[in-house]
Regions:
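Long, highly charged low-complexity segments enriched in Glu/Asp and Lys/Arg with interspersed Ser/Thr
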Residues: 100, 105-111, 218-287, 291
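Extended serine/threonine-enriched, polar tracts that run as long, contiguous segments within proteins
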Residues: 148-234
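OB-fold ssDNA-binding interfaces and closely related basic DNA-contact patches used
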Residues: 1-168, 282-284, 288-291
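Surface-exposed polar/charged interaction patches
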Residues: 18-21, 40, 199, 251-254, ...
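Non-transmembrane, interaction-prone segments in cytosolic or luminal domains
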Residues: 70-71, 76, 173-191, 246-260, ...
């Protein structure tokens, strides 16, 4: 691996860079084998007996967290996560192929990031856009569709976990990845991480308690994560945590290798097509010889 995947809790500055915490402290300048945390957008209904009558109830409430374990979806309204590291990327949903355009994952978003479509930043222009109103409508729409994403990797415990029928389940210290792409959720995680940074504490040394809050948009209801950094209890970093940290680092590198491979193939193809179009645009001109 290109980076030393060892947690040194006595070297905050170096570890803050490696784990991605420096992004918040400084102000925000392939198929996954990891379980993914998602938010349940709609309630899951079920039947329950109330006063001798069968009534429809919300077995799983909207806004609950969901993760897949052993082929089964598990839900909880509250979770406790231990963040080993975070990375940042851009992503955009491509409805034409029902898939995502994704960039490589980086320690921050201050540089142009190659994406798996052979471009950069999923099509977002480089640098700060000073006059958004001056852009074309198509460019505005493109930029709005691109999500700034905080990729969180760590372990999670689901509090009072159940399945979709309300049966008790157990998720304790389970490795996960979570792509937080809502604006408020992105900011909330940053605030919690910055709280650790202000106390010169690595995120892996503490838990975060996470719930969700409902938000309303035009004709739409959605949910955002609310994070609370728990500085009251310090967690030990032992050999098992070191091994898991190395696995997370390797997972990020695997994602980046895949994106770079896709970029290389599609960028070369794009360049070839552009050269062909340029060549075809030339018009042969007959030059008369002067006697």
């Amino acid at each position: 691996m290109s980076e030393l995947a060892v947690i040194d809790s006595n070297n905050y500055a170096a570890m803050a860079q490696m784990t991605g915490m420096a992004y918040d402290a400084e102000g925000g300048k392939n198929k996954s084998t990891l379980a993914r945390i998602k938010l349940q957008k709609k309630p899951i209904k079920g039947k329950a007996e109330v006063n001798g009558k069968n009534v429809t109830v919300d077995v799983v409430t909207a806004g609950s967290f969901m993760i897949e374990k052993d082929g089964k979806n598990v839900y909880a309204e509250n979770i406790k996560i231990r963040m080993f590291l975070q990375r940042f990327m851009y992503q955009k949903y491509d409805s034409t192929v029902n898939n995502y355009v994704k960039t490589v994952m980086a320690n921050d978003l201050d540089i142009d990031l190659k994406d798996n479509y052979g471009g950069f930043n999923c099509g977002k222009p480089s640098g700060y856009i000073q006059d958004f109103a001056a852009l074309t409508d198509s460019m505005k729409e493109l930029i709005r569709s691109i999500r700034r994403t905080r990729v969180v990797l760590g372990t999670v415990t689901f509090v009072d976990a159940t399945d979709e029928k309300g049966n008790t389940e157990e998720v304790v210290d389970m490795p996960f990845v979570w792509e937080v792409d809502s604006k408020e959720g992105f900011r909330n995680f940053g605030e919690a991480t910055n709280k650790f940074a202000k106390h010169q504490r690595l995120s892996v040394m503490h838990n975060m308690n996470v719930t969700t809050a409902e938000r309303e948009a035009v004709g739409n209801t959605y949910y955002v994560p609310i994070c609370e950094a728990d500085l009251g209890t310090t967690l030990e970093v032992n050999e098992s945590e070191q091994a898991l940290f190395a696995d997370f680092m390797a997972w990020v590198e695997s994602h980046n290798r895949w994106v770079l491979s896709e970029w290389e193939q599609k960028h070369v193809k794009k360049a070839s097509e552009e050269e062909k179009e340029l060549a075809e645009s030339f018009v042969d001109i007959d030059v008369e010889e002067v006697e």
